[in-house]
A protein has these predicted regions:
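Short, amphipathic alpha-helical interaction segments positioned at domain boundaries
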Residues: 886-896
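A short, conserved structural fragment
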Residues: 863-877
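…; additionally, a secondary subgroup of soluble metalloenzymes is captured
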Residues: 1-482, 489-647, 651-812, 818-829
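Short amphipathic alpha-helical interaction segments
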Residues: 850-862
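Extended intrinsically disordered, low-complexity coil regions enriched in Ser, Thr, Gly, Ala
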Residues: 90-97, 853-856, 871-872
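Accessory beta->alpha helical hairpin/"wing" motif in late/C-terminal subdomains of nucleic-acid enzymes
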Residues: 842, 873-886
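Short acidic, hydrophobic short linear motifs in intrinsically disordered regions
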Residues: 835-847
Length: 896
């Protein structure tokens, strides 16, 4: 008997030998392999030819296999019989006339089309196990020719990474730290590792893990440790946590390292791990993936009870919460307590405001700030703080009071709506409540002043709603086809947000009064729909519903010689007509056709009820007022733009919002929720009597609520009818798309000066905050900044950026763009000069020297130059352009 071979044949080994046979032009035959005479596998095919494997423990078994073979197929015999025992007759039936002793390395050489093998691949303990593991783990179509005919360790292991673990898909994609980070988050990473272990065996698995750790560069230590601990799926969230530590916090560091088997990592390893992870999270993952990673990382922090260390994080929610608390403390400490008698004096000191601004900038630099609703609320609070830090001049008379509301106090109301959306945590919520209370105290005085002026002006010295058609709309329609949009209940505060939304769609706001300012009108009193809207559309003081509005509007058109011709439907559309939208469309056919017909219908009016409806059914304070929010408004403006129409947006009255603080006051003879005729019951501190021809009651007099907390009926989401400017002053917004008409002037700087932070160069050196800040990580990060750095920004930054080699390369890479270097420099300078490093689209357009309608395209060109390698230095969104100065410096290699 011959000696029994200890080699076990596998399908990959057999396939490799069949390949060699095919290379010698064999198409079928008997392949004899010296191996254990055992076979547990199934029959298979090789390149379309069936393969039968037969275990042959004896010469007799060999003869049986030879006799029963199909000459058109492959027969593979596995035997341990020695050649001398076989005889020449048996050997003559075998390929090459002999038994072949398979070598797995030889099989791999053939599969990879290699002539030699790098020693680093096979000079290991039990190298045959690694070779067999490779043959077993790799699929038949995984093999690619070894470069230069040398099968290297890198080539073999990269094939495993690609074929078994799917770390990369393309053979040309290098496996590096980023690839490993991305792979660690894939859904099938655990399954892939199990498959590798089961098919490739422990020797190949260990060899591959060692190789993958080396390919991970600066991440080799954590990758090796987590692969060994079967926790590679935690590589990214743990990498986020790794950024929390330095040598000064040995306790937290020890807890982290000890809990995850990372004891051989030092601070430099953690720093590298964090930097690589941060790059992946901020630049490669979408918002949902980012949230998943950061939520997991935050859970790890909570489990390890290292929240103090996490307070300095620029990525983790704990870091955001800490910055919110710092800003909250700065606001609370800066507010006057108790309130002074003179509320129009500066209520915050310069020092307090600087401290607030410093913490606000720090908060905005946190990665999660843009998507956190608490941060958005504090955006409103910081604006309110700036307003409180500014002394307010007294407003004498209705004209000045109205101007103050349009230019300043309506923006206060806009910021109040934002701040009142609140924060989740107790300390930030208390800070918001504190500043809101101070603002309401000052705003309440302004409301009383406005109401008193309203009562003193039966014939108002301001634009009134019944004259808007005569004075503004009809003159515009005589020079340009016009769409009049009456948004019932639209307040000035909501308009501030709405106009910004229109600018994002390429609209430019024109000054109706040619004074570069937003126009307004005074509603009819009491400020109710059937009085004020009817008066608006009829062009005279009148009370009524849709019918009188229609007839009055058509009469106006006839008198102005703007009536529709050609038998088309009346060019005024209320809710019923607007709602007749055919399936698949966005506008009713009659509405769409009327807007498109600029020849026969020069002036078209539509009435939208959405805002007024929210006062009864929804939450106006939680609504973002934009073209998508207000039903039909977006499609209407789109149709108007296509038709080349000028758009006038106005309202019949504004509104105030219910925040759970109002109380019902019993009065007789009420008009809606905020007006009554019960003159015997008058609270002079909270109500005002108004009289005159514009008061559309039987006696031409009425009592109007001034205090926002008074209502005369059931609780709603909001109210109107009273004498606050939020209810009585309505917007008159004129919009054009494209070139400005001859003689027209755009609205410039509708926002008050405090809406954006004061330019850095105009401010004094900031003082150090008394609020204790969390310890920052030892390493510098892209988000590191402090008050000293902010104050040090000078005119040199823009000059230095455009002078760099990187800037020149970016210009070249950007290809054909219209923007010139001087325009980009001007934009940079404008952004740097603002301590918050942000401006409106209108301000950006001015800096770039382009029309507002073209600014989005210009900004996209600027981003192609300023955003280096995917790092976003210039951010554009929600009508705001923001510069990340830290990223700009980092990517262009400048210091100031």
């Amino acid at each position: 008997m011959g000696r029994l071979s200890t080699f076990t044949a596998t399908e990959p080994i057999i396939r490799a030998r069949l390949k060699k046979a095919r290379d010698k032009h064999y198409k079928s035959g008997v392949l004899g392999l010296r191996a254990k005479p055992t076979w547990d596998g199934e029959a298979f095919t090789y390149e379309g030819t069936p393969v039968t494997v037969v275990a042959c423990p004896s010469v007799l078994a060999l003869w049986e296999a030879i006799d029963q073979r199909n000459p058109e197929q492959w027969t593979v015999v596995l035997t341990g019989v020695e050649d001398d025992d076989l005889g020449d007759t048996v050997l003559a039936h075998l390929l090459d006339g002999r038994l072949i002793t398979p070598d797995p390395w030889d099989a791999l050489r053939g599969n990879f089309s290699a002539t030699t093998i790098e020693p680093a691949l096979y000079r290991t303990h039990n190298d045959r196990a690694i070779a067999n593991g490779l043959l077993t783990a790799l699929s038949p179509d995984a093999y690619t020719p070894a470069p230069g005919g040398v099968l290297t360790r890198d080539h073999a292991m990269a094939t495993i990474a690609r074929d078994v673990l799917r770390i990369v898909k393309d053979v040309d994609v290098e496996i590096d730290s980023l690839a490993v980070l991305e792979w660690s988050r894939s859904q099938d990473v655990t399954e892939g590792l199990i498959t590798l272990s089961a098919s490739g065996g422990p020797e190949l698995t260990a060899a591959f893990q060692s190789w993958l750790s080396e390919r991970s560069g600066r991440l080799r230590k954590p990758v090796r440790a987590l692969l060994a601990a079967e926790r590679i799926t935690d590589l990214v969230p743990l990498g986020v946590v790794a950024g929390l530590f330095d040598d000064s916090d040995g306790k937290s560091l020890g807890v982290f390292l000890g809990s995850h088997g990372l004891s051989d990592l030092d601070v430099e390893d953690l720093h590298s791990w964090y930097q690589n992870t941060r790059g992946l999270v901020t630049n490669s993952l979408n918002a949902q993936q980012q949230q998943a990673v950061l939520t997991t990382a935050a859970s790890i922090v909570n489990e390890l009870a290292i929240n103090d260390a996490a307070a300095a994080s620029e990525l983790l929610p704990q870091g955001l919460d800490a910055r919110l608390v710092q800003l909250s403390d700065a606001i609370t400490d800066g507010l006057p307590n108790p309130l002074p008698a003179e509320l129009d004096a500066a209520l915050l000191s310069d020092v307090a405001l600087r401290d607030i601004e410093t913490h606000w900038i720090n908060l905005q630099q946190h990665f999660l700030a843009d998507r956190d609703h608490s941060c958005r609320a504090f955006g409103g609070a910081v604006r309110l703080a700036r307003w409180l830090a500014s002394p307010v001049a007294p407003a004498q008379g209705l004209k000045v009071s109205t101007e103050r509301y349009v230019r300043v106090d309506s923006w206060v109301d806009t910021a109040l709506v934002t701040a009142r959306r609140g924060a989740d945590q107790p300390i930030p919520a208390a800070a918001l409540r504190a500043i809101i209370d101070v603002v309401l105290a000052r705003r309440g005085q302004h409301d009383l002043s406005f109401a008193a002026a309203l009562a003193d002006a039966p014939t108002p010295p301001v634009q009134t709603i019944e004259n808007v058609m005569h004075d503004l709309v009809i003159p515009i329609a005589k020079t340009s086809p016009t769409l009049l949009v009456v948004v019932d209940g639209l307040s000035m505060a909501a308009t501030n947000d709405l106009v910004r939304s229109t600018q994002l769609e390429g609209w430019t706001e024109l000054s109706a009064n040619h004074d570069a300012r937003r126009a307004s009108a005074l509603a009819v009193l009491p400020t109710l729909t059937q009085r004020s809207r009817c008066s608006l559309l009829c062009g005279e003081l009148r009370e009524g519903g849709d019918g009188p509005e229609r007839s009055g509007f058509l009469s106006l058109l006839h008198t102005a010689q703007l009536e529709a011709t050609g038998g088309v439907p009346d060019p005024i559309f209320h809710k019923k007509a607007l709602d007749a939208v055919p399936s698949g469309a966005k506008l009713a056919s009659d509405v769409r056709n009327a807007i498109a017909d600029v020849t026969r219908q020069p002036l078209v009016a539509v009435v939208l009820n959405y805002v007024d409806d929210t006062l009864h059914h929804v939450d106006p304070g939680g609504t973002d007022w934009n073209l998508e929010t207000i039903t039909y408004l977006g499609p209407l403006l789109h149709a108007a733009k296509n038709a080349g129409r000028t758009v006038v947006i106005t309202s019949d009255h504004g509104h105030i919002i219910e925040y759970g603080t109002s109380a019902k006051v019993t009065r007789a003879n009420t008009y809606g929720q905020r007006a009554h005729g019960d003159f015997a019951n008058l609270d002079p501190d909270r109500e005002v009597v108004v009289k005159g021809p514009r008061v559309l009651t039987e006696t031409n007099s009425v009592v109007l609520a001034v205090d926002e907390n008074i209502r005369y009926g059931a609780r709603n989401a909001g109210y109107h009818g009273g004498a606050t400017p939020a209810e009585a002053v309505v917007p008159v917004v004129v919009l054009v798309a494209g070139e400005l008409p001859e003689g027209a002037s755009r609205v410039v700087g509708a926002e008050p000066p405090w809406w954006y932070a004061e330019p850095v160069k105009a401010r004094d050196e900031p003082t150090v905050s008394s609020v204790k800040r969390p310890r920052k990580p030892a390493q510098d990060t892209l988000f590191d900044d402090d008050s000293e750095a902010v104050a040090a920004l000078t005119n040199r930054l823009a000059d230095n950026v455009v002078a760099t080699r990187v800037f020149a390369e970016q210009l070249a890479l950007a290809g054909r763009i219209v923007l010139q270097q001087a325009q980009i420099k001007s934009l940079l300078q404008t952004l740097v000069d603002n301590s918050a490093h942000e401006v409106t689209l209108a301000q950006a357009a001015a800096a770039l020297g382009v029309a507002t309608a073209s600014v989005n395209g210009a900004l996209m060109q600027a981003k192609r130059v300023l955003d280096v390698e995917g790092y976003e230095a210039l951010r554009v969104g929600s009508g705001i352009v923001r510069l990340d100065v830290a990223v700009l410096k980092e990517q262009f290699g400048v210091s100031e």
